[in-house]
Amino acid sequence: MTVVAIVGRPNVGKSTLFNRISKDNSALVDDLPGVTRDRNYARVSWNDKPFVIIDTAGFVGQDTSAFEELTREQILLALDEADILLFVADAKTGLHPGDAELADLLRRSSKPVFYAVNKIDGSEQRRHAAEFFELGLDRIYPISAAHGFGISELMDDLCAAIPEAPAQTAEEEESGGAIRVSILGRPNVGKSTLVNHLLGAPRVIVSPVPGTTRDAVDSHIVKAGQEYVLIDTAGIRRKGRTREKLEKISIIKALQSVERSHVVVLLLDAVEGVTDQDLHIAGYIKERSRACIVGINKWDAADKDPKRTKRFMDDLHDRFRFLTYAPVLTFSALTGRNVARLLPTVKEVFRQYNQRVTTGIVNRALEETLARHEPPQAGNRRRLKFYYATQTAVRPPTFVLFCNYPQAIHFSYERYLTNRFREAFGLDKTPIRLIFRPRQRTGGTS
Ligand SMILES: Nc1nc2c(ncn2[C@@H]2O[C@H](COP(=O)(O)OP(=O)(O)OP(=O)(O)O)[C@@H](O)[C@H]2O)c(=O)[nH]1
Ligand SMILES: Nc1nc2c(ncn2[C@@H]2O[C@H](COP(=O)(O)OP(=O)(O)OP(=O)(O)O)[C@@H](O)[C@H]2O)c(=O)[nH]1
């Protein structure tokens, strides 16, 4: 998945541009309820090119007192991890020394960079925009993120730089019947230790210093006749940076790994608990409808007081309640205790993720579900009616339900249907998707 990062000085309009690009293309991101909207990355599609767009401001916080340092860090991060850079400057303030410095850094990159000058909403700003040619750039895109001016020219050109044909299908074929698994989690949570344990030999360097593993490599293993590909086994860190920065950086890599996975193992630290970043990754897993297992590592070091354990688990379920389908496992990658449960669980989750249900069974379940709890009235006082349903896809199991007023279905009724389908089809450990369609008339008679 191509990652496009928006970079620029504070207050130039990065977030506004991010919102415009992601909002105008919300088809792909909006069809899943209950996922947090408060975030700085989005999967969008422009001219049929899917990509992930990231507002880097979110990675460095709002501490403007140290903004030069922060901005530099942000640029380096984006240069490292993104595929395309989108530089934004502010025509209202005009050319700023910081812009020149950033442009300099970007010019040294081998990645495509698009330079936009924002806040072009009047003739005065247009004059200011000309100043930016002093940066020695071939092409500058005058835009107004707030009003939409110039956005399509910019995005059309940017999308042309995104490679055709996502590698997804090729990769799918290549991996045959293998289950693609990624192990994600913040630095020091024990990813390398776990991978080494699974591989049965210390192939990945483990160290108590965060960020000691480098290159992205996939590892193949066969257990009990099932092949697994551990994606990006080297993990999601960088050498020689502070822990705090590392945690901010890792999200881009994490998102890319989610894209490539069937099943994501989200590792948490039993001692440190759940962080916002864990929830961010979890939100993305949900949004991308990937199967997931929550692995609580370092269980050997956890406080075994039953009350605390209960509080930990309650808190976990509460914070991951949008991901109820993810089984939770506790283990210790260090001692190996209970790690043996992981791959069988991955296999079971994957089985459900690929499950097919015949149309007859789907419709029987639909009938029973409706009989048990009638659909509420649609807004226009007409009765909401479901006609029939059928499974249209796997990974995840996806069901299309034909009804008279798809737009009138309340979220709570959708949740009810989802839960009943899960129960009826034994799909408790996989995401499933329900799509509501207006009934299509066939044949052209009557
Ligand atoms: N006039 C005008 N104002 C804009 C435009 N785009 C953004 N702004 C304003 O510029 C200000 C900063 O916008 P943000 O999108 O928050 O900028 P940012 O670069 O994300 O800022 P940081 O998060 O501080 O780095 C806001 O008050 C926006 O309303 C535009 O096209 N025209
Ligand atoms: N007590 C305990 N320590 C563990 C366990 N798993 C890993 N550790 C320790 O945690 C530290 C970090 O482990 P790593 O496997 O390097 O963690 P990582 O997630 O790969 O870390 P980064 O390279 O920073 O991303 C090491 O000192 C491990 O020995 C566990 O199950 N129990």
Curated annotation (Swiss-Prot):
Residues 2-166, 179-354 form the EngA-type G domain. CDD domains: EngA1, EngA2. The keyword Cytoplasm does not apply. Residues 355-440 form the KH-like domain. The keyword Repeat applies. GO terms for molecular function: GTP binding; ribosome binding. GTP 2 binds at residues 185-192, 232-236, 297-300. Keywords: GTP-binding, Nucleotide-binding, Repeat, Ribosome biogenesis. Coiled coil: none annotated. One of its GO terms (biological process) is ribosome biogenesis. Pfam families: KH_dom-like (PF14714), MMR_HSR1 (PF01926). GTP 1 binds at residues 8-15, 55-59, 118-121. GTPase that plays an essential role in the late steps of ribosome biogenesis. Associates with the 50S ribosomal subunit. Belongs to the TRAFAC class TrmE-Era-EngA-EngB-Septin-like GTPase superfamily. EngA (Der) GTPase family. This is GTPase Der. The lineage of its organism: Bacteria, Pseudomonadati, Thermodesulfobacteriota, Syntrophobacteria, Syntrophobacterales.
